[in-house]
Design a protein with these regions (language model features):
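Active-site helix/loop of acyl-thioester processing domains in fatty-acid/polyketide metabolism
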Residues: 172-187
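N-terminal accessory segment detector
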Residues: 1-152, 160-169, 198-208, 212-234
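Low-complexity, intrinsically disordered Gly/Pro/Thr-rich segments
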Residues: 188-197
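Alpha-helix boundary/interfacial micro-motifs
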Residues: 174, 192-193, 220
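Short, well-ordered coil loops that connect the C-terminus of an alpha-helix to the N-terminus
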Residues: 142, 187-188
């Protein structure tokens, strides 16, 4: 067999490993943490709680330990392995919560810079867009989606983490991811809406986020300043 042919077959048969292992780790940790071992068995609905109890299995615990080692070694995962994890979560009645929580955890890996909380909102939106773009690319090893019109509008078609989910539950992953990034950036109350979804028949998925309140610390600071002014006037 010619060398170039052997090399070609090896390339085809070996899946590309692009996804950081921490993606798998956070998904399984959220799955495990959602389980409630203290549920009252007599009152439970087995069709609802049994799939959740599966998250406490030895198989999941062993895989969590494997991913913990992979994270330390910088090992990356193949898309097929990540999609299998998403399919596992989709079968659970609390899948949306697991995806949302994992998205938030993966977005909060870095310590937020507080300077972004005192700049104009247009700057905050620009910073948030940059953080979403960079962190998703770092996690999945490629560009994930893009940005549409508006201050914060994430868009994409056939995104890597949604390919395994025709029902749209996995979309909550990016909802949680964007929510965390915006909260870190602005420090106040944030609203993220999944306004378009391919699972609902739209031609693409879209997430729109906005700041709807000031950071609590800034509000308290203003209140303290007002009290000092009033005290001085008296």
């Amino acid at each position: 067999m010619p060398p170039h042919k052997a090399e070609s077959e090896l390339t085809v048969s070996t899946p590309t490993r692009r996804v950081q292992a921490i993606v798998g780790l956070r998904l399984l940790e959220m799955l495990r943490d959602q389980d409630l071992p203290g549920e009252i068995l007599e009152a439970e609905d087995p069709t609802q709680t049994m799939p959740r109890r599966l998250g406490l299995s030895d198989v999941v615990d062993r895989q969590i330990r494997t991913y913990q080692r992979d994270v330390k070694k910088g090992v990356r995962l193949a898309d097929a392995e990540v999609l299998d994890l998403f399919r596992l979560i989709i079968r659970r009645p609390d899948g949306e919560e697991v995806f949302y929580g994992a998205g938030r955890l993966l977005a909060s890996m870095e310590r937020p810079s507080r300077w972004t909380r005192v700049v104009p909102q247009r700057v905050q939106y620009a910073v948030a867009r940059g953080r979403v773009k960079r962190r998703l690319k770092r996690l999945f090893g490629r560009r994930v989606g893009g940005f549409g019109r508006g201050p914060f509008s994430v868009e994409g078609r056939a995104l890597v983490f949604i390919e395994s989910d025709p029902g749209g539950e996995a979309c909550h992953f990016l909802s949680g991811f964007c929510q965390e990034i915006l909260e870190q950036t602005g420090g106040g109350v944030v609203q993220v809406k999944h306004t378009l979804c391919q699972a609902r028949g739209d031609d693409q998925c879209r997430w729109e986020g906005m700041f709807i309140d000031e950071p609590a610390e800034d509000i308290q600071s203003e209140a303290d300043s007002s009290e000092r002014v009033e005290a001085g006037e008296r």
